[in-house]
Curated annotation (Swiss-Prot):
Protein name per the record: Interleukin-1 receptor accessory protein
Reactions this protein catalyses: NAD(+) + H2O = ADP-D-ribose + nicotinamide + H(+)
Chain segments annotated as coiled-coil in the UniProt record: none
Functional summary from the UniProt entry: Coreceptor for IL1RL2 in the IL-36 signaling system. Coreceptor with IL1R1 in the IL-1 signaling system. Associates with IL1R1 bound to IL1B to form the high affinity interleukin-1 receptor complex which mediates interleukin-1-dependent activation of NF-kappa-B and other pathways. Signaling involves the recruitment of adapter molecules such as TOLLIP, MYD88, and IRAK1 or IRAK2 via the respective TIR domains of the receptor/coreceptor subunits. Recruits TOLLIP to the signaling complex.
EC assignment: 3.2.2.6
Recorded superkingdom: Eukaryota
Gene source species: Homo sapiens (Human)
Tissue: Detected in liver, skin, placenta, thymus and lung. Isoform 4 is predominantly expressed in brain. Overexpressed on candidate chronic myeloid leukemia (CML) stem cells, hematopoietic stem cells and mononuclear cells of patients with acute myeloid leukemia (AML). Overexpressed in patients with chronic obstructive pulmonary disease (COPD). Expressed in T-helper 1 (Th1) and T-helper 2 (Th2) cell subsets.
Cytoplasmic side: 389-570
Occurrences of domain TIR (ranges): 403-546
UniProt keywords, alphabetically: Cell membrane, Disulfide bond, Glycoprotein, Hydrolase, Immunity, Immunoglobulin domain, Inflammatory response, Innate immunity, Membrane, NAD, Phosphoprotein, Receptor, Repeat, Secreted, Signal, Transmembrane, Transmembrane helix
Residue spans, topological domain Extracellular: 21-367
Keyword Transmembrane helix set for record: yes
Record GO cellular component, one term: extracellular region
Length: 570
């Protein structure tokens, strides 16, 4: 029987198609009316012809002898098929201009067509139906309607949508409300009231998806309708203000030189207003940018706050501004349902700063030259500068330090080194500079113990002056004893400094104390005839290493002449 019905339906459908295909008004596929329903739930779909395309209703069409025919195209197929209205329990049925599914299945997804026709008239339209699945939290790919509530505006309600016509008014359904996954029960400011959900005070925390599940009986069966909508809390009209222009303002002046790029932002704040059209635009000399000849580009960006307050920014750009452009009037305008405002930007031509190129170059060159001269002077005369400072501002190190000698001289005991020490060093340091030297062979008493007296002399001296020569590094000499004692005293107590004077070059030595001393201490080199003059670099280096002492130097020309002549004869 079912097979016979299918064959007959296809036969008559083919006849209808062939007769009416050439003269039927086909409105095509109305994608704007895509219908989405949940699987295993009932759905009722009205033919869109009577709602959007035709000027008469179904009753008028039926009275005029027109017949409404339904057929469909399965998903991913091209073949149009008649709808089977003989399924068990009348799962799919038609009632006047409504197509019923009790309930829908996933394979019901496709494009459905309703055709109104008779022998002289034909009109049809198709629309897509999508059956979707939902999870336990009512999540699905379905597009959700958005309902906006005013923040802190008093009691507001939302209503469970799209449930009219599914059951008669005599049936009392059961309605359960959810926020996300959670059943709404004992919420602070949200109260279910049947088909309505009341918000006592809408807050930002109330943003989210709300679902109503409507359960009703029909012919001994129980059906469920699931409807989800998104609640968005927006700014209250009580707090709405006219547009506020943040930029341009009186505090910012756009100064540009001809040829530079001119960028002027117009930033406007709009309070949220339901169905308000927010507009921002520029005028240049009272005209819109499109009505003038200059090359102007305007870029716009829009951002929203959590309560849907809007900030619009339009940036006016002129790539290469001219002197004439900098004299024009640039005004930003804004309009909303609350009013219209305008603000002019302050634009002017930048006055070029005077250029002191030559003066700056000369000043910079003079500064560099002065710095170079100072560096050279310091490098050449740093010894003189140190000695000058010590002579006038230095603190006398010899006061109350308990020392008897300024310098203990350590040297190799042979004729050449002794002559250098006794005549040259002693002559200048004692006679010219006024230092008190301790020379063991001169100042020690006969019969004493050499080791004890050596250590005693070193402890009584402020400096240990070591005269280095090849003979100095011979093992077992008194000179090495003096060196070791001085270095140990300097390292452990710090009350004596060691001065190294190289009288003659010393090759590699196995004396580790001397190796260590030459690594950490500066060596003052004696250069023979070049170093004999008391005002020469050798003696100045030696003076810097000596203790600061406020003792008058011998200044008579006779004594200086004698000393210098004696040095020349050494």
């Amino acid at each position: 029987m079912t097979l016979l019905w299918c064959v007959v339906s296809l036969y008559f459908y083919g006849i209808l198609q062939s007769d009416a295909s050439e003269r039927c008004d086909d409105w095509g596929l109305d994608t704007m009316r895509q219908i989405q329903v949940f699987e295993d739930e009932p759905a009722r779909i009205k033919c869109p012809l009577f709602e959007h395309f035709l000027k008469f209703n179904y009753s008028t069409a039926h009275s005029a002898g027109l017949t409404l025919i339904w057929y469909w195209t399965r998903q991913d197929r091209d073949l149009e098929e008649p709808i089977n209205f003989r399924l068990p329990e009348n799962r799919i049925s038609k009632e006047k201009d409504v197509l019923w599914f009790r309930p829908t299945l996933l394979n019901d997804t496709g494009n459905y067509t309703c055709m109104l026709r008779n022998t002289t008239y034909c009109s049809k339209v198709a629309f897509p139906l999508e059956v979707v699945q939902k999870d336990s939290c009512f999540n699905s790919p379905m597009k959700l309607p958005v309902h906006k509530l005013y923040i802190e505006y008093g009691i507001q309600r939302i209503t469970c949508p799209n449930v009219d016509g599914y059951f008669p008014s005599s049936v009392k359904p059961t309605i359960t409300w959810y926020m996300g996954c959670y059943k709404i029960q004992n919420f602070n400011n949200v109260i279910p009231e049947g088909m309505n959900l009341s918000f006592l005070i809408a807050l930002i925390s109330n943003n989210g998806n709300y679902t109503c599940v409507v359960t009703y009986p029909e012919n001994g069966r129980t059906f469920h309708l699931t409807r989800t909508l998104t609640v968005k809390v927006v700014g209250s009209p009580k707090n709405a203000v006219p547009p506020v222009i943040h930029s341009p303002n009186d505090h910012v002046v756009y100064e540009k030189e001809p040829g530079e790029e001119l960028l002027i932002p117009c930033t406007v704040y709009f309070s949220f207003l339901m169905d308000s059209r927010n507009e921002v635009w520029w005028t240049i000399d009272g005209k819109k940018p499109d009505d003038i000849t200059i090359d102007v580009t305007i870029n716009e960006s829009i951002s929203h706050s959590r309560t849907e307050d809007e900030t619009r920014t339009q940036i006016l750009s002129i790539k290469k501004v001219t002197s004439e452009d900098l004299k024009r009037s640039y005004v930003c305008h804004a309009r909303s349902a609350k009013g219209e405002v305008a603000k002019a930007a302050k634009v002017k031509q930048k006055v070029p700063a005077p250029r002191y190129t030559v003066e700056l170059a000369c000043g910079f060159g003079a500064t560099v030259l002065l710095v170079v001269i100072l560096i050279v002077v310091y490098h050449v005369y740093w010894l003189e500068m140190v000695l000058f400072y010590r002579a006038h501002f230095g603190t006398d190190e010899t006061i109350l330090d308990g020392k008897e000698y300024d310098i203990y001289v350590s040297y190799a005991r042979n004729a050449e080194e002794e002559e250098f020490v006794l005549l040259t060093l002693r002559g200048v340091l004692e006679n010219e500079f006024g230092y008190k030297l301790c020379i063991f062979d001169r100042d020690s008493l006969p019969g004493g113990i050499v080791t004890d007296e050596t250590l005693s002399f070193i402890q009584k001296s402020r400096r240990l002056l070591v005269v280095l020569s090849p003979n100095y590094v011979l093992q077992g000499t008194q000179a090495l004893l003096e060196l070791k004692a001085g270095l140990e005293n300097m390292a452990s107590r710090g009350n004596i400094n060691v001065i190294l004077v190289q009288y003659k070059a010393v090759k590699e030595t196995k004396v580790k104390e001397l190796k260590r001393a030459k690594t950490v201490l500066t060596v003052i080199k004696w250069k023979g005839e070049k170093s004999k003059y008391p005002q020469g670099r050798f003696w100045k280096q030696l003076q810097v290493a000596m203790p600061v002492k406020k003792s008058p130097r011998r200044s008579s020309s006779d004594e200086q002449g004698l000393s210098y002549s004696s040095l020349k004869n050494v």
